[in-house]
Amino acid sequence: MKHIAEAHRYIDNAKEILSTKAQKEDGLYHDKKYVKMAGNNAYSGVLEALDGFFGLKKKGRKSVEWYQEELGKMDRKMLLNFRVAYDTLHLAMGYDGNLSVKVSNAGLEQAEAIIDWVEMKQGVVASN
């Protein structure tokens, strides 16, 4: 499950960027550039885990709608988690650079929940 280790590495990198470069003070980050970097890293981790789970090759990326459709067929709760991760990590952090520490923490928690779900699902599949 190389893709799971890689997904966790993306999340760890996002956390490192936020803790060392984004300058947290009073519940806010002060450097939008690093919040954007962290959001993009974390969202890439989510996609890395899902790509490995769905057996996608590295060339090209599926649309967010494709991921939503595939997750919707399998697990409605995980579909909702993915939508929150997309909105928080990709849009609010990655594009807008939302400076709220609470927003960043919520996005990272969603990312970890998705990666853990993929890891659990693959463990179940591997044991069958």
Predicted regions and their residues:
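Terminal alpha-helical segments
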Residues: 1-128
